[in-house]
Amino acid sequence: MWNYTDKVMDHFMNPRNVGEVENPDGVGEVGNAACGDALKLTFKLDDEGRIADVKFKTFGCASAIASSSALTELIKGMTLEEAEKVTNQDIVKLLGTLPEAKMHCSVMGMEALQSAIAKYRGLPDPFANDDDHEGKLICRCFGVTDVKILKVARENDLHNAEEITHYCKAGGACGACLGDIQRILDDMWKFKAAQK
C-alpha cells in the first residue's frame, strides 16, 4: 500500500474539475489506457487570455487522479504563458509529495497541459506518438524516446534507470530497454560533468 499525504487522498476522494470543458480552446491527451494510464485535459480561456475553466478525465490510479485534480486547481486563472511554466514538481509540491514510483502521474499531468497549449497555438503535439516524433524510440512498451528520457532526467535530476521508470514508465514493462536507458543517463551526466 502506498503512503499518501492527506492532500493526495483529498484530491483522490474528492477530485476537482472532472469531466470535459464544453467547446474547449485547448485539448491535451497523453498516455494510453492499454498501458494503465491516460489523461485528457481541456481548458477554456476568458477574454483576458486566462484559463477560466479546466477539466480532466483520467484512466489511472489514485496518484493519477490526485495529480490531475491538483493540476487543474493550480492552473485555473493563469495565462498560458504562466501555465506552460508549471512543472511536475509544482504538482507534487501542491500535493505534499507522491511516492517515487508514482511520479509519472505528475509528469503525465504536465505533459497533457503542454500538449493542450501546443495544440491551442497550432503547434505540433510534443507528445504525439507518431513516426515524426522527435528522438529514437527506446522503450517500445510505453513509446518513450531518448529525447523524453533526457528531458525527464534533466528536469528531475535523475541518474538511474529505475528513477526514469518512476517518472515516465520507460523500462517498466518488459525491461529490455533498461540497459539502454542507463547508458543514455550515464552519457548525459558524463557530458554535463565534462562541461564544468
Language-model-derived ranges and their functions:
Residues 66-82, 112-116, 144-158, 178-194:
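Iron-sulfur (Fe-S) cluster-binding segments and ferredoxin-like electron-carrier domains
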Residues 35, 44-110:
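Active-site- and interface-proximal helix/loop "cap" or "latch" segments in soluble metabolic
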Residues 58-70, 100, 135-149, 166-186:
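Local cysteine-cluster metal-coordination motifs and their immediate loop/turn environment
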Residues 1-23:
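Extended low-complexity intrinsically disordered regions
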Residues 101, 123-129, 194-196:
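Flexible, glycine/charged-enriched surface loops at secondary-structure junctions
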Residues 49-59, 125-136, 157-172:
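Immediate flanking context of iron-sulfur cluster ligation sites
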